[in-house]
From Swiss-Prot:
Function: Catalyzes the folate-dependent formation of 5-methyl-uridine at position 54 (M-5-U54) in all tRNAs.
Gene: trmFO
Biological classification of the source: Bacteria, Bacillati, Bacillota, Clostridia, Eubacteriales
Protein source organism: Desulforamulus reducens (strain ATCC BAA-1160 / DSM 100696 / MI-1)
Residues the entry annotates as binding FAD: 10-15
Subcellular location: Cytoplasm
Protein's recorded name: Methylenetetrahydrofolate--tRNA-(uracil-5-)-methyltransferase TrmFO
EC number: 2.1.1.74
Family membership noted in the UniProt record: Belongs to the MnmG family. TrmFO subfamily.
Cross-referenced InterPro entries: FAD/NAD-bd_sf, MnmG-rel, MnmG-rel_CS, MnmG_N, TrmFO
Cofactor: FAD
One GO term of the biological process aspect: tRNA methylation
Keywords: Cytoplasm, FAD, Flavoprotein, Methyltransferase, NAD, NADP, Transferase, tRNA processing
PROSITE patterns: GIDA_2
Amino acid sequence: MTEHRVTVIGAGLAGSEAAWQLARRGIHVDLYEMRPQKYPPAHHTAYFSELVCSNSLRAAAIENAVGLLKEEMRQLDSLIISAADNHKVPAGGALAVDREGFSRYITETLEDHPLIDIHREEVTKIPEKGIVIVASGPLTSESLSHEIAKVTGEQYLYFYDAAAPIVTLESLDMTKVFRASRYGKGEEAYLNCPMDQDEYEKFYDALIHAERAPIKEFEKQVHFEGCMPVEVLASRGKDTLLYGPLKPVGLTDPRTGKRPHGVVQLRQDNAEGTLFNLVGFQTNLKWGEQKRVFSFIPGLEDAEFVRYGVMHRNTYITSPVLLQPTLQMKEHPRIFFAGQITGVEGYVESAAAGLIAGINAAALAKQKDLLIFPKETAHGALMHYITTASTKNFQPMNVTFGLFPELTVRLKGKRERGRAQAERALEILKEWIEKEKICDI
């Protein structure tokens, strides 16, 4: 009997998911991860699928496109979503996780699988033979980047993502902080640091004049809106933050009974509830400046920072030119790409791309027909976008209902439209899974 083998480069969210989907279909996997031999910027552990930005996988409800994407992944036996469901922490209407428990679970699951061989070493060249999934992520090493550039024949597009700081609960002044979720939704999942106008103006002035960490001159900064450094956002105008991460809508300061001028929210970062991250505070400020500037936030005057914010490169290919909706290269169909390097944006989207690449690589290994997900599903809509979008200004994309085909009926409310989109998607996905016998690939 012929042994089917697939090489997966990178054990981030996409690579881990791809390896899992392959192994559960009887495919032997060689999974390569350069950590701990070599650490890219922003990574702190050797665990697979380390979350280097937020610990939130965003909205849980299926009326939201990313909530639907997660539910579709559950139907497809996603390892990443299983790990998230097993390690969730309170986060209102979002699915947030204990980041260490989440990554450890994924690592141990893959290490224990008899069909997965783990190689803790850097890959500098794409194998010349065999099926390969490149899931090296937004922090692809320089040597592998050069190799990918050779294979794709395309120049890289790149920008920076920025991670938010994490503080300890016990170091906060809870006389100034209150627990609540906006509009009272879900549990009182967030710590809220209210600011009056004077406090906000002092904080804003310190922020826009703070010293930033240096960036190499040859690297042009192009920020994705979903992970915009807070100081860059602030530089757009004095009130910009009040309509972004510091928006006070839906919150009432119990000390005054009124809506604050601005609010900084902190979200639980671990299962024990001892660590909290500053929501929307991705930053590239120098560490000393972060300590100084963020102490202007009420309640954080003496905060203990267990992790300062960092900024890191995010590299992605021009997928509309290079990839099929199966995530195979058009010119080299034995090579798949998956994760953020394809131009999807977000943890869940990256894992979903890994899921698709894994299923299709298994099909290719078994000489079966490869699959293109229906465009009415979140998976299909996202893959359709990244492989057919205009190449003139191709930008990373989160999943959104704007990518889906229009509904045949007109509904007024956003929530009602989202619910209808989700119900249609899940019904079509269920029928498609049965028709294509995905579990039998």
